[in-house]
């Protein structure tokens, strides 16, 4: 999370800046499992197809969120090998800063996140798990939970606590993800579960906390967090 106001007021503005080049400045990764474009024809009993995991500030923007999101969706962050843990494979969206420094300039707040592919993915999903990073002074060593999908949010809290991970439902309006315009709340049920994880808490998930090596050095703490998130999504 940047210290000051965003450089760009929207993703449209970010993409319009010729200084930003896909594959150099930023990257986009997403996966959508097969479903009908017609909402009424989408299956209602397949939690995998119905759920999307997002890291809208991935890569170097809010470091570590890409890796968490991929693993929570069921794909190993280093190899993209699908999980066989029995908790399914989910759709995902990642927008990743690729700069060696200054990735905070690519942060567009969730309520101004008018990315067309991401919007389509969310609007055609029933549930959303959204991963964010915040400052240590905001999190105080405790994962901050929010979003308008209170059922999933509360299940995430329960599973995190069962895994021995400190978490709480935040009352900070900068972190609570409760704006209806938050892209992650634009699901078919009008809500998401949002996690805000402090800088140091994200750093502790990896043996080597650099963009090239995070995916290769995930540790027990990382997989404990991911396991709790995957169990949570299987319960809704």
Model segments located where?
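N-terminal catalytic or cofactor-binding beta/alpha core of small enzyme domains
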Residues: 1-236
């Amino acid at each position: 999370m940047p210290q000051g106001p965003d450089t760009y007021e929207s993703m449209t503005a970010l993409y319009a800046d010729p200084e930003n080049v896909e594959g150099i400045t930023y990257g986009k990764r997403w996966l959508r499992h097969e479903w009908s474009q017609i909402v009424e024809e989408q299956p209602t009993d397949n939690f995998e197809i119905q759920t999307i995991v997002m890291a809208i500030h991935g890569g170097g923007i809010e470091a570590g969120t890409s890796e968490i999101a991929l693993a929570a969706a069921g794909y190993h962050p280093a190899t993209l090998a699908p999980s066989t843990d029995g908790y399914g494979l989910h759709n995902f969206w990642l927008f990743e800063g690729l700069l060696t420094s200054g990735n905070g300039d690519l942060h567009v707040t969730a309520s101004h996140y008018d990315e067309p592919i991401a919007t389509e993915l969310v609007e055609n999903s029933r549930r959303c798990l959204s991963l964010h990073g915040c400052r240590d002074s905001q999190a105080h060593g405790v994962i901050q939970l929010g979003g308008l999908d209170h059922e999933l949010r509360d299940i995430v809290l329960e599973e995190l606590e069962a895994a021995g991970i400190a978490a709480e439902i935040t009352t900070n309006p900068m972190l609570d993800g409760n704006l209806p315009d938050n892209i992650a709340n634009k699901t078919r049920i009008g809500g998401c579960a949002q996690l805000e994880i402090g800088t140091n808490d994200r750093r502790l998930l990896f043996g080597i906390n650099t963009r090239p090596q995070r995916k290769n050095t995930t540790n027990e703490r990382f997989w404990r967090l991911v396991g709790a998130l995957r169990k949570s999504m299987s319960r809704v």
